[in-house]
Amino acid sequence: MQFIIMDLEWNNAYCKKLKGYINEIIEFGACKVDKDFNVIDEFSVIVKAQVGKKLQGRVKALTHITNEDISNGVPFFKALSMFRNWVGDDENVFFSWGDGDIRTLIKNYEFFLKKNRIPFVNNYCDAQKYCQSFIPRLRLRNKSGFLPLLSSLELIRMNFRITGHLMTACLLQLV
C-alpha cells in the first residue's frame, strides 16, 4: 500500500467553453510516504496554463508561481502522465487537507480528458475531515466552519518546517 500526500496548486480562470470558471491546475505537488509516514519520494511539476493565461494576484502571492512559470510549464496531458507514472500501479491512498485538491483534480480530468473517474487514485482521505473528528471544533473553526491547518498544528503543538509545499510538510506531521 502506498500513501500519497497531494498538494495541488490551481488558478481560478474564466473558460469560454464552459461559460464559467474552472480551477485550472498549475502545479502537481505530492510526496509518497511509507507506513510510518517517512518521506520516500517527492513529485512536483509546473503545468502550462491552457485556460487562464494570467495568474490571480493572490495565487501568485500564495504559491510564488509566476506567469512566466505557467507559460513555460509542462502541458496538462504530459504533467498528468508524469504524475500517473510517478504514482505507479500499487494500491494507494491519497491524502489532502480538505477536499479541494481531489475535487480540482477530478474537474480538470473531466475538462481535459472527458472522463470523470481517475483510474490511478484507488482510495482517498480528507485529512481535515479526519482531524475534525478528534480536535475540539469550537476552538479552531474559522468563519466558514472549516478547521484551519495552521490552527490544528498549533493546538496539537506540532513542529514543522516550511518548504515549497507548506501543506504537504504539515500533513506529514499530522498523519
Regions picked out by a protein language model, each given a short descriptive name:
Residues M6-L8, V45:
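Preference for bulky hydrophobic residues occupying beta-strand positions
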Residues A61-L80:
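Metal-dependent phosphoesterase signature
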Residues Y21-F28, K32-T63, N85-V175:
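Metal-dependent phosphoesterase core characteristic of DEDDh/y 3'-5' exonuclease domains
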Residues M1-I4:
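Extreme N-terminal starter segment of soluble prokaryotic enzymes
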Residues L8-L18:
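Short acidic, Gly/Ser-rich segments with clustered Asp/Glu that frequently serve as metal-coordination loops
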